[in-house]
Every structure is written in C-alpha cells, then in structure tokens.
UniProtKB/Swiss-Prot annotation:
The lineage of its organism: Archaea, Methanobacteriati, Methanobacteriota, Stenosarchaea group, Halobacteria. One of its GO terms (biological process) is cobalamin biosynthetic process. One of its GO terms (cellular component) is ATP-binding cassette (ABC) transporter complex. The gene is cbiM. The keyword Membrane applies. Keywords: Cell membrane, Cobalamin biosynthesis, Cobalt, Cobalt transport, Ion transport, Membrane, Transmembrane, Transmembrane helix, Transport. This is Putative cobalt transport protein CbiM. Pathway: Cofactor biosynthesis; adenosylcobalamin biosynthesis. It comes from the Archaea. It is found in: Cell membrane.
Length: 220
C-alpha cells in the first residue's frame, strides 16, 4: 500500500502529513515512556520494527502508484497499542522511503495514516473487544487481519480522494471502490496469511514466559 513518491497531489500530501504528525509525536513520547519504565522493552520494540520492516518490504505490484504486501503492524499494535505503533511504523516507512525507494517522503504522511494509524487502531479495537471471549492467538489473528485489510481500505480511499472519477463525493467513492477491488485480489489472502503468522509469533512469545511480555499485559 506504499503510495510512491510524488504520486499524490501536493494538497493531499500536505493534508495527510498534518493529520499524521501529532499522533506520531505522541507515539514517540509513549515509546520513550515505556522504554524508560522497563529497558528490556527496547529489544521488543526493535524486534517489532524489524517484523514490520521485513513483512512490509515483501511487495507485489498492484494499483498504479502503490503496492500490495503484508503490513506487520497488527502484531505490533497487540504488543504496544496504537500510539507506539504509529511511531514505529513511521520509522519503518521513513527508512524504506529513503533507502529502498519504497513509498516516498511526500507521501509519508498518507502511508503513516493508513499503515501506522487507522489500520492498527481498527485492529487494536477489535482485539480489545474480542480478547475476553477468545484465546490470545485467535484475538491476535483477527486483529492482524483487520489491521491489514483496513490499511488497504484507507489507501483506496486516499487514492480515490486524490484521483476521483469526476466531481463530488460519489466520484470519490466510485474511484476508491475501483482501487479497493484491485487490492482485494491480492490482499484478502495476504491478510489471512499475515494473521496466521502474527498469531504464531504472539503465541511463541508468550510461551517463553517473558516478564517483559507480561508487563505489557498482552497475555492478560
């Protein structure tokens, strides 16, 4: 879903950057706070960043100006919550834009909103609702799948808003649905596979009996 450099009109690029900035700053503060509370969390944050980086770098061609790939942020949001996920996803997206030409600087805000903010927040909300009624692995699976699919839905809306099929809200929706239809071909199976992987990883981490994991209340 990385929208490539220069693809969005300047006004949309600026709008998404302004929308993402305060949340990313708050996420940075939250990340610093949890690391200060327990230095061991730093290693877990680093592992989470690596997980997101590796999965989101596995890109497949999709809609013009974008790509299709796992996001990795579903696992991260289960571990740390939406704010920290927004900040860590920004680190990954910035690194990929600068060094891998994956995404872009002008489109960083839009990509952060989709992959780092709205997608993970939807997954985290679902996790919070269903966790009391199901196992940790099942809840994580659902969170990761919804995070992935929502990320691509948001990207479709971003592209639809930037390149509407005409004038008015209806034209934006029609264009967004066209983008979403193309994403669906690859992203439905990718999202399910990502959910399975995230559930396996969270299960493995909790079976280690890590005090750091327990301190994050993931296993609660």
């Amino acid at each position: 879903m990385h929208i490539m450099e220069g693809f969005l009109p300047p006004r949309w690029a600026a709008a998404w950057t302004l929308a993402a900035a305060p949340i990313v700053v708050y996420g940075a503060k939250q990340t610093i706070d949890i690391i200060r509370q327990d230095a061991r969390v730093k290693a877990l944050v680093a592992i989470g960043i690596a997980f997101v980086f590796i999965l989101s770098a596995l890109k497949f061609p999709s809609v013009t100006g974008s790509t299709s790939h796992p996001t990795g942020t579903g696992l991260l949001v289960v571990l740390f919550g939406p704010a920290v996920t927004a900040f860590t996803a920004t680190i990954v997206l910035l690194y990929q834009a600068l060094l891998l030409a994956h995404g872009g600087i002008t489109t960083l805000g839009a990509n952060v909103v989709a992959m780092g903010i709205i997608g993970p927040t939807v997954g985290w909300t679902a996790y919070q609702i269903i966790r009391p009624y199901t196992s940790l692995e099942r809840a994580t699976f659902i969170a990761a799948v919804l995070t992935d699919w929502t990320t691509y839905l948001v990207t479709s809306l971003q592209l639809g808003a930037a390149f509407p099929a005409g004038d008015g809200l209806d034209a934006i929706i029609i264009s967004a649905l066209d983008f979403a239809a193309i994403f669906t071909l690859t992203q439905v199976p990718i999202g399910i596979l990502e959910g399975i992987l995230a559930a396996a990883v969270i299960g493995y981490l909790t079976r280690l009996g890590s005090e750091t994991i327990e301190s994050l209340e993931v296993a609660a």
